[in-house]
From Swiss-Prot:
InterPro entries: DUF520, UPF0234-like_C, UPF0234_N, YajQ-like_sf. Keywords: Nucleotide-binding. One of its GO terms (molecular function) is nucleotide binding. PANTHER family: UPF0234 PROTEIN YAJQ. This is Nucleotide-binding protein P9211_04811. One of its GO terms (cellular component) is cytosol. Belongs to the YajQ family. Nucleotide-binding protein. It comes from Prochlorococcus marinus (strain MIT 9211). It comes from the Bacteria.
């Protein structure tokens, strides 16, 4: 029996599932009667999605379809950080959607402090863009996961738990 147990807390998403959701979104834009003539474009870059379309109304429709497709692909909607829309050349509307990936140092410190304040029997260490939580009891680690779940809702960030040993 192991003397200590641990798990990692990360903020990540499956990039291939996002690619699949964007492909489905593009297909629906080309087939839906209200979006077909809007001359809309959706580009997936490394850390953002750029949506370009003809009006605010079609932009809102495309946002809704994007969220719907992401939900069906089991992606957390918290990964999307919608920026305000802006007008671009040719009377078109453009919106940049940043993708949240990884824990920032500030966010990692907040999460670490929240767990250390409530649970004295576990240690939390920051490792780059993830957290490592170790403890002698699996029950303590389960309590830490509950605290992380509450903080996930408060701070509006997607969290996953990996390498539970």
């Amino acid at each position: 029996m192991a003397s200590t147990y641990s798990f990692d807390v990360v903020s990540d998403f499956d990039h291939q599932e996002l690619v699949n959701a964007i492909d489905q979104l593009k297909r629906e834009i080309s087939q839906r009667y209200d979006l077909k003539e809007s001359n809309s474009e959706v580009e997936l870059e490394e850390e953002k999605i750029i949506i370009t379309t003809s009006s605010d109304m079609t932009l809102q429709a495309i946002e809704g379809v994007l969220l719907q497709k992401a939900t069906k692909r089991k992606l957390s909607l918290k990964i999307f950080d919608f920026q305000p829309s802006e007008t671009s050349s040719g009377n078109r509307v453009r919106q940049i959607v940043n993708l949240r990936k990884g824990l920032s140092q500030d966010m990692a410190k907040k999460l670490s402090k929240a767990v250390r304040d409530q649970l004295k029997k576990v240690t939390v260490s920051i490792q780059g863009d993830s957290l490592r939580v170790t403890g002698k009891s699996k029950d303590d680690l389960q309590s830490a996961i509950e605290i992380f779940r509450k903080k996930e809702e408060e701070l509006d960030i997607p969290l996953q738990f990996e390498n539970y040993r």
